[in-house]
């Protein structure tokens, strides 16, 4: 029995969940998100929230059970509190600034990199070396953060590049004379 899958997903006040046969739509203060369930699991809405259960006892159904429950919990968390990723620019002259909804990055290249924020994602620059990405969809927030980080990933010798706040960069020793 799945330790995660057997727990019901509580629906807090101010959030409405619409459950059909194979899909779930969740509306809240941060927006509206929806997902479709895989064929191996079924969902029911009860008094204590949404309960996910496997249709049979196959290995795949048991694997999907916990995953689908976690995805539903991510939807509810996203429309209530949202998700946030913070990036840090490390390096001389590495700067970030907003131009409307686009993020302009100076990363030591011969040109500036401009990244357009997708719909549903908010990018903010506090200090010139810090970028905050927020949104309701956990997967899209992480994907946008990874795409921005990919412009200049941290290198192991001096640690220069774009890294997640709190990320540990494994360092290497330089050449010996």
From Swiss-Prot:
Gene3D superfamilies (UniProt xref): Ribosomal protein L6, alpha-beta domain
UniProt GO BP: cytoplasmic translation
The UniProt record lists the keyword Ribonucleoprotein: yes
Gene Ontology cellular component annotations, sorted alphabetically: cytosolic large ribosomal subunit
Molecular function (Gene Ontology), one example: structural constituent of ribosome
Keywords, sorted A to Z: Ribonucleoprotein, Ribosomal protein, RNA-binding, rRNA-binding
Domain of life, per lineage: Bacteria
Similarity field: Belongs to the universal ribosomal protein uL6 family.
HAMAP family listed in its UniProt record: Ribosomal_uL6_B
Subunit text: Part of the 50S ribosomal subunit.
Function: This protein binds to the 23S rRNA, and is important in its secondary structure. It is located near the subunit interface in the base of the L7/L12 stalk, and near the tRNA binding site of the peptidyltransferase center.
Name of protein: Large ribosomal subunit protein uL6
Organism field: Maricaulis maris (strain MCS10) (Caulobacter maris)
Lineage: Bacteria, Pseudomonadati, Pseudomonadota, Alphaproteobacteria, Maricaulales
UniProt gene name: rplF
């Amino acid at each position: 029995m799945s330790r995660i899958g057997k727990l019901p997903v509580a629906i807090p006040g101010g959030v409405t969940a619409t459950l059909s046969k194979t899909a779930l739509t969740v509306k809240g203060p941060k927006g509206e998100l929806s997902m479709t369930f895989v064929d191996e699991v079924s969902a029911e809405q009860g008094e204590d929230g949404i309960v996910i259960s496997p249709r049979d006892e196959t290995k795949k159904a048991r694997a999907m059970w916990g995953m689908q429950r976690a995805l539903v919990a991510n939807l509810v968390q996203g429309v209530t509190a949202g998700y946030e990723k913070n990036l840090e620019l490390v390096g001389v002259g590495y700067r970030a600034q907003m131009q409307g909804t686009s993020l302009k990055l100076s990363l030591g290249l011969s040109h500036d990199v401009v990244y357009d924020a997708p719909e549903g994602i908010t990018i903010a620059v506090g200090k010139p070396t810090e970028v905050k990405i927020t949104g309701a969809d956990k997967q899209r927030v992480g994907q946008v953060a990874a795409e921005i980080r990919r412009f200049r990933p941290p290198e192991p010798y001096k640690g220069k590049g774009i890294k997640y706040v709190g990320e540990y960069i494994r360092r290497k020793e330089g050449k010996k004379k």
